Amino acid sequence: MDFESFTLLAATDDLGVEPAARVDADGLELRMDFADEPLAQLDAYDGDLPILVTNRPTWEGGEAADTAGRLDALETALEHDAVTAVDLELAALEGAGDHDAGRVADAARDRGASVVVSTHNFESTPDREAIVSRLERACAHGDVGKMASTAQSPDDVLAMLGATRELTAEGEQVATMCMGAAGRHSRAVAPVYGSRIGYAPVDPADATAPGQYDLATLRTLVGQLQSDA
């Protein structure tokens, strides 16, 4: 996955959804921190869709313990041919935790995999200038800078969309979205402004973040909006 155009990922903790996801998704995001035996799942995987692996630590809203094993698992996952991208937290790459996330980024590049550098705010959305600054830092570490924040108002969504458009115009690859009810529509609208990645579960009951649409709905909405743009 090179993310040169919009890529819709089916977010899941179970690679068994691949046949159903194939209808609407361009790839899968395997949430290793939510999954049972994620490395065994990768060993058994014979699907067609490429995979982005995420092993989110508890301090960034996930369920993985902040141990060297979290990064070791990502590095092992990258040995699988189907894994063509990895998500690493901006804070980890800038020194949060006691372990070297940079080695995973290096391993990904050695294998020709893309690096998505992510940052999250589960409480609020900063102003546009702060969003741009955060995403620029993320882009400096990886191929795509990803930011998800919680919107409390339409103004928060406008700040995120404005930052997305600004950075896209500068040639950066970013993936952006606002979480929560006030920001839900951003998941469909942000690709029109340049966001390169969307995330959605096949089944809405399996959402991995607040405000996610199900996969088929998001594919339809994005397709309609992009065709009108």
From Swiss-Prot:
Residues reported in the UniProt entry to bind 3-dehydroquinate: 29-31, 56, 187, 208, 212
UniProt keywords, alphabetically: Amino-acid biosynthesis, Aromatic amino acid biosynthesis, Lyase, Schiff base
InterPro entries: Aldolase_TIM, DHquinase_I, Type-I_3-dehydroquinase
Catalytic activity annotation: 3-dehydroquinate = 3-dehydroshikimate + H2O
Annotated EC: 4.2.1.10
Pathway(s) where this gene product acts: Metabolic intermediate biosynthesis; chorismate biosynthesis; chorismate from D-erythrose 4-phosphate and phosphoenolpyruvate: step 3/7
Function: Involved in the third step of the chorismate pathway, which leads to the biosynthesis of aromatic amino acids. Catalyzes the cis-dehydration of 3-dehydroquinate (DHQ) and introduces the first double bond of the aromatic ring to yield 3-dehydroshikimate.
Stated name of the protein: 3-dehydroquinate dehydratase
Lineage: Archaea, Methanobacteriati, Methanobacteriota, Stenosarchaea group, Halobacteria
